[in-house]
């Protein structure tokens, strides 16, 4: 989103073990309620979690958001559906249970693809809103 909007930013990649744990502790000491990766700092304020970070960027840039409540709802529904899919994928892949993985591959993945294709087919073009990334 930031690159597409030509916003200068510093990308910092942290290792999960030592670097993130130290940074998380620091953020908690600064008063952050639930620090997670990814997060973004804007004007000295920290914003956490994938979807809320994307929403704050969209609001601050005045881009990547719907033009009305229906479009905003569609974006939220699309985002939540992707999050649901990722949760099921992670549980299946990292859960270590062959039955869960089989169910994911045969059911959840297929259903997620159908749902996302249905959502993307509401408007002509490759994006949620059709031919443009945003309206």
Q: What kind of feature is each model-predicted range?
A:
Residues 126-135:
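Short, intrinsically disordered, charge-balanced linker/junction segments flanking boundaries
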């Amino acid at each position: 989103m930031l690159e597409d909007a030509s916003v200068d930013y510093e990308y910092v990649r942290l290792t999960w073990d030592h670097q993130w744990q130290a940074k998380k502790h620091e953020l908690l000491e600064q008063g952050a309620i639930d620090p997670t990766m990814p997060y973004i700092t804007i004007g000295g304020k920290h914003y956490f979690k994938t979807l809320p970070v994307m929403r704050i960027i969209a609001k601050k840039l005045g881009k990547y958001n719907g033009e009305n409540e229906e479009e905003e709802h569609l974006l939220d529904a699309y985002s939540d559906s992707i999050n649901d899919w990722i949760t099921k994928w992670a549980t299946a892949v990292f859960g270590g249970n062959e039955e869960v993985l089989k169910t994911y591959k045969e059911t959840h993945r297929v259903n997620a693809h159908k749902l996302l294709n249905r959502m993307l087919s509401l408007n002509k073009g490759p994006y949620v809103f059709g031919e443009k990334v945003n309206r």
